[in-house]
Structure formats: structure tokens, C-alpha cells
From Swiss-Prot:
The modification Phosphoserine is found at S140. The modification N6-succinyllysine is found at K59, K69, K85, K158, K187, K203, K216, K226, K232, K301. Coiled coil: none annotated. This is Electron transfer flavoprotein subunit alpha, mitochondrial. Residues 205-333 are annotated as: Domain II. Domain I shares an identical polypeptide fold with the beta subunit ETFB though there is no sequence similarity. It comes from Mus musculus. Belongs to the ETF alpha-subunit/FixB family. GO terms for biological process: amino acid catabolic process; fatty acid beta-oxidation using acyl-CoA dehydrogenase; respiratory electron transport chain. The modification Phosphothreonine is found at T93.
Length: 333
């Protein structure tokens, strides 16, 4: 039996929806927007109400122009100051608090990247609210879904905080269209520099390969490769597929590759069109970081390896024979 909602309840629900407003904290490198920000904008749009983006930094005019064209963005707030160089959370937090105070945003969010995970807990603490981390679905403006137990279970969280602060798993939401929008831009509210930390320098490793979290194809290796030198087999294969190269935690802990290549619960979350797992047994922590991939191919000589339980295609064979053969076949095409 269904019971109709009282008119007063419907009016309150409509009122709440009408007054929803979300502030997306843009992650960027001054001249380019981080892809996860586009996924976060899509998530923010599902809350209903107006979506604004806050861009803080130095010489970030191009990012502002690009954001104004993104579908679903109503307003871009801009704060340019040397204090925001490097997007330090200590400096960004007072700016976000002042912006929220002036515009009364009901939601504040960012991508669940190192940037967002570093910033949002501080913002939430200052607002005296509990943040919701790494959401994968939005059921309503106050109800979110996130994974627990290394991705083996889903947890639905109802948030009754006055301001909802949450981070968004980029792989769970489509990227917002980068054209079709016509947002206005204006200066963000001013805030005083905290001055307790200073951005000194950043050294980035440049690679011709795609960035791991944004690649359409990922080739990952595990402890089965036996050494860091043997990862050259994966690099050669990845070159033919225009793929990024990742690794399991076991391979990282063994010192085969640096930890910025780690895929998994404590590493990077990926969801490419094609994921090739080479010499990876399939610990649940690794599966949590790649199980949403569209197609998974596993290569392992152990037919009982857990990775085969999630793989769409499995090759039970010696990787030192199979991978070079795959590379040679691709070279001939």
C-alpha cells in the first residue's frame, strides 16, 4: 500500500532541491585542468541546484576560461595570489570557508585525488562537520554511496550535516562536457594568507605515456615479473598499445618500480577500457583499484590466481613467453 506524501512535505522537498548549491574546488596546474575535476562537476550536477567552481592559484586565466565553457557550471570564482601557489591546503582552507560563508553553499566537493584528500578533511574540520570520502554514487542531496572493505561492499551514507563535504571517485562519474557551457566568472571573496607554509618547488617526471588514472589502456605488472628490469617487457607492450604502465603493491614493495605506479586501494584507482594484469595474483587491495575496468585480461601461470575471478579473458601461461609474443604481433600490425 502506498501513502501519499503530505503537501507540506512535498513543498519542503521542492524547497530543499531549489536551494541546493554546490562548490567544486578545481584541481589544476595553472594552465590545465585536472581531468578529475570534470568528473566531480558531473557528480555535483546530480545534486540539483547551481554548481560553482572555485579556481585558486597564480596565472590560471586559461583554466578559468576552460571552466566557463564546461557544461553544467553556472559560475566560476577566481582567486589569484602567490599564497595559492601549489594549492596548499593551509592556504586554500580559509578561502573556501570565506567563499562558503558568503554564498551559503550546501555542498563542497573535490576529486578524491591526493589534492582532494589533503584539502577536504581540513575544510570539514573547520566547518565542524564530518566529510564523506571517495563517493561512487549520489542517491539524493544528502545520501551517498561509497565502497568499504577494499571494494567488496557498498556503504550508503546519509549525511545530516549543515554543509556536506565530500570527495568524488573520478572513475565512477563521466567527465563533464568541455563545451556548451556559458558560465560567468567573478572574483572570489578575499581571505588573509595564513603564512604557516610556503610552496618551494615541484619536480615532475615527464613521460610520453598517458597518465595512469586517465589512460584508456593500462598494463600492470606484479611480483611475477621477478625484478624491475623485467618491467621492460611491459614497457615494450605498452608502447605498442599507447598504454600507461602500473604495478601491484607487491611489485612496489619489492622495489621493482616507484610507488607512483601503484594501482590499488592504497594506490591509484583506474577504470580504463582495457586493463592487462601481468604476473599479478589479484589481492583484494589490488582488485579494489581496477575492478571497474571495462575489459580485464589476466596473464598468470597459476590457474588458481584470484585475478582470474574478475578477468574477462585469462591466459594461463608463462608471462616471459606470452608478453614478448604479444608485443611482436602488435609490431607487425
Amino acid at each position: 500500500m502506498f501513502r501519499a506524501a503530505a503537501p507540506g512535505q512535498l513543498r519542503r522537498a521542492a524547497s530543499l532541491l531549489r536551494f541546493q548549491s554546490t562548490l567544486v574546488i578545481a584541481e589544476h596546474a595553472n594552465d590545465s585542468l585536472a581531468p578529475i575535476t570534470l568528473n566531480t562537476i558531473t557528480a555535483a550536477g546530480r545534486l540539483g541546484g547551481e554548481v560553482s567552481c572555485l579556481v585558486a592559484g597564480t596565472k590560471c586565466d586559461k583554466v578559468v576560461q576552460d571552466l566557463c565553457k564546461v557544461a553544467g557550471v553556472a559560475k566560476v570564482l577566481v582567486a589569484q595570489h602567490d599564497a595559492y601557489k601549489g594549492l596548499l591546503p593551509e592556504e586554500l582552507t580559509p578561502l573556501i570557508l570565506e567563499t562558503q560563508k558568503q554564498f551559503s553553499y550546501t555542498h563542497i566537493c573535490a576529486g578524491a585525488s591526493a589534492f582532494g584528500k589533503n584539502l577536504l578533511p581540513r575544510v570539514a574540520a573547520k566547518l565542524n562537520v564530518a566529510p564523506v570520502s571517495d563517493i561512487i554514487e549520489i542517491k539524493s542531496p544528502d545520501t551517498f554511496v561509497r565502497t568499504i572493505y577494499a571494494g567488496n561492499a557498498l556503504c550508503t551514507v546519509k549525511c545530516d550535516e549543515k554543509v556536506k563535504v565530500f570527495s568524488v571517485r573520478g572513475t565512477s562519474f563521466e567527465a563533464a562536457a568541455t563545451s556548451g557551457g556559458s558560465a560567468s566568472s567573478e572574483k572570489a571573496p578575499s581571505s588573509s594568507s595564513v603564512g604557516i607554509s610556503e610552496w618551494l618547488d615541484q619536480k615532475l617526471t615527464k613521460s610520453d605515456r598517458p597518465e595512469l588514472t586517465g589512460a584508456k589502456v593500462v598494463v600492470s605488472g606484479g611480483r611475477g615479473l621477478k625484478s624491475g628490469e623485467n618491467f621492460k617487457l611491459l614497457y615494450d607492450l605498452a608502447d605498442q598499445l599507447h598504454a600507461a604502465v602500473g604495478a601491484s603493491r607487491a611489485a612496489v614493495d619489492a622495489g621493482f618500480v616507484p610507488n607512483d605506479m601503484q594501482v590499488g586501494q592504497t594506490g591509484k584507482i583506474v577504470a580504463p577500457e582495457l586493463y592487462i594484469a601481468v604476473g599479478i595474483s589479484g589481492a583484494i587491495q589490488h582488485l579494489a583499484g581496477m575492478k571497474d575496468s571495462k575489459t580485464i585480461v589476466a596473464i598468470n601461470k597459476d590457474p588458481e590466481a584470484p585475478i582470474f575471478q574478475v578477468a574477462d579473458y585469462g591466459i594461463v601461461a608463462d608471462l616471459f613467453k606470452v608478453v614478448p609474443e604479444m608485443t611482436e604481433i602488435l609490431k607487425k600490425k
